[in-house]
Amino acid sequence: MALISLAIDYKKSPIEVRSEFALSGLDVSMLYRSILAIDNVVHAVILSTCNRTEVYLEISDLRVVDDILVWWQGYVRNPNYKIKDYFKLRQGTEVIMHLMKLACGLESMVLGEPQILGQVKDSYTLSKKNHAIGKELDRVFQKVFATAKRVRSETRIGYCPVSVAFSAITLAKRQLDNISSKNVLIIGAGQTGELLFRHVTALAPKQIMLANRTIEKAQKITSVFRNASAHYLSELPQLIKKADIIIAAVNVLEYIVTCKYVGDKPRVFIDISIPQALDPKLGELEQNVYYCVDDINAVIEDNKDKRKYESSKAQKIIVKSLEEYLEKEKAIISNSAIKELFQKADGLVDLSLEKSLAKIRNGKDAEEIIKRFAYEIKKKVLHYPVVGMKEASKQGRSDCLVCMKRMFGLNVEK
């Protein structure tokens, strides 16, 4: 079984590309059913966030990568975008190292941001819920979570309050000096939307409107702030008229706010959704200011230096953690092989022993039967090692011969 991952992320792909290849907003159960239906795909975990879409897989044949790319391409709306031009393939320990760094926030656009760990955990949970994760992949994710917890507790990588959500609010503050007199509309009440809400409430705006597909979730979040209100997405046309700042963090497959919704009133539009929820053409209107996820980079760069030192400490923890994981995996593999070896030996002994005991019970010479039993066991136990040594000798594999000699306590010098 081999461990691989296929990824499209912000490092190689701009927002319009990431939007096309995003798997968020699609039926999760359908996604897992379809990917597990591919021959040689054994287990899978699908992660899709604003900055990346990644698929982690246990496969039985590396040639299946082409089939997975075809599967992924099938969800792309614009045929001009070809996944082979953008994806990155990782294999084996590279996958585990990347996932550890990712969960710790070292691969994020915002260095050390904590939200990604929650997103990785959510993806893991959904995979389990859809019976798509196996023992090996499960062990990988458990070690990843333990590593991320250790990094958070032993470093200050997440000390600065910097996230995509925080950076979005920073951009809004740059455009509008006095947010306390402004109305803010947040679209989406997921993890990022809730984080946005918390950052906005700290600025004490005149009013916060939170729109979501299900109003119950929005009501739960807004109940803690007296100037906040919860709304359905269907109310967006009316809400936009009131809003000075519109921030979107929602999973949709097409634009839900376009130029037809806005008049001459100056507004700040910030879209951190993938795929994009706010039409970029909003920024072409003279009175508007428009930012997308990629525009947040400038804000993020200001905070990177503060975290670089903590990042190096986190890297050391990750390297150590990976070494621990690999050592444990070696033990699991060897223990499994040892168990199988004993089961094989038990099978050989049990069969010959039963035959020998039956002969003794029938009055045959016990001494002769025991000698014969010992000879048969010796012959059966040594059959495969002898065949293997002969084959290794034919192929000139002296390393295999030395290894087998050591296994049986023979003199390796001869």
Swiss-Prot record:
Where on this chain does NADP(+) bind?
A: 188-193
Q: Which gene encodes it?
A: hemA
| Record-listed E.C. numbers | 1.2.1.70
Q: Which named protein is this?
A: Glutamyl-tRNA reductase
Q: Report the HAMAP family cross-referenced here.
A: Glu_tRNA_reductase
| Listed Gene3D superfamilies | Glutamyl-tRNA reductase, N-terminal domain, NAD(P)-binding Rossmann-like Domain
Q: InterPro entries, from UniProt?
A: 4pyrrol_synth_GluRdtase, 4pyrrol_synth_GluRdtase_dimer, 4pyrrol_synth_GluRdtase_N, GluRdtase_CS, GluRdtase_dimer_dom_sf, GluRdtase_N_sf, NAD(P)-bd_dom_sf, Shikm_DH/Glu-tRNA_Rdtase
* Highest taxon above the source species: Bacteria
Q: What is the lineage of its organism?
A: Bacteria, Pseudomonadati, Pseudomonadota, Gammaproteobacteria, Thiotrichales
